[in-house]
């Protein structure tokens, strides 16, 4: 059975990488096969799906759509154009802005909020939106490790290691993960300029678009503020963030439907939710559960421990780069959850403070997702946004941006974490 599961797992990712148009159907079909084979029970499959993530996606997609229809992104676009007057500078600024926002809210939510601005600018000046939307996604993934609330993997680490919000800024008198990530972000700025090197257009001052209704923007801001506040609440229900996003979407939708001149109809707002992306993620959650059930992730972890021995630098190096490699192809959440006890055990055996290995794991697992279009939920969301605009993104297209961005950011973080904590 284990061989069958591994074969199906590999087949799924091959299809997703080579036939991106059908990836959601491949993931869903293989997930169903896993249930039929008995690798995952029907109840376990339902529980394996992270409904919090699904609800966050659906709610944010709906609210962002209404915000777009209210012309708020268009207004921001025009303000950026008038301020920077260069397509290259605007696209670089959007990527950096995406990273900043993502340090405090979910990566996927960040992409859903910032990508529409990138699309609006690309459409206005008749340039391809592919590079700018993808850099928004990879920048959001980079900064997700900066704070406790930036990414699910950070939350997993903090919960396991007993860290609080401020430990990501200063821990044991040393700079925390936040500053490591900022160093990585600074290192990627030349990469961003290289990606947009051909965008040499100078832009004339443009008339600023008027927003037709500010309520969707208020709903979006309320969503962000509520997510940040919720991050400080201990022992909150698992669905809290998802319920927040869905609540504000339903609230603003109800408000718009009741207006004489709504920014969009309720029907259009619901259809704006990217159900292909939701199906893809749901299938992946079940597949990863199946792979975990047959012990594949445990086998990989044990092999890692046997290979590393007791050389700290070797352990750290293998941990970081192995995490980058694994997270390029599978969701980093189950990987990090599995590796945290392994890292803790290694540290205990060597009598070391585990902070070095904890942050090495987080850096590698978070940034590794930027290598492939299926390595992180934010990448999948970005691909879904571009697909709706008529752009099918191949693995090669994504990797031309993701690989150099990842290598520069990981090397910077890898060196700095070692210098600070070793």
Task: Indicate where each model-derived feature is located.
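Helix-loop-helix module between adjacent transmembrane segments
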Residues: 61-65, 85, 97-107, 138-147, ...
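Alpha-helical transmembrane segments of multi-pass membrane proteins, especially transporters
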Residues: 27-31, 61, 91-98, 111, ...
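Membrane-core helix-loop-helix motifs of multi-pass transport proteins
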Residues: 125-217, 353, 380-415
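C-terminal transmembrane helix pair
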Residues: 170-183, 314-422
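Hydrophobic transmembrane alpha-helices of multi-pass small-molecule transporters
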Residues: 1-68, 173-302, 400-422
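Membrane-embedded alpha-helical segments and adjacent helix-loop junctions characteristic
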Residues: 43-130, 280-349, 355
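Residues that define the loop-to-transmembrane-helix transition and helix capping
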Residues: 24, 52, 89, 130, ...
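Re-entrant/interfacial helical elements at transmembrane boundaries that shape
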Residues: 74-76, 109-120, 133-134, 146-163, ...
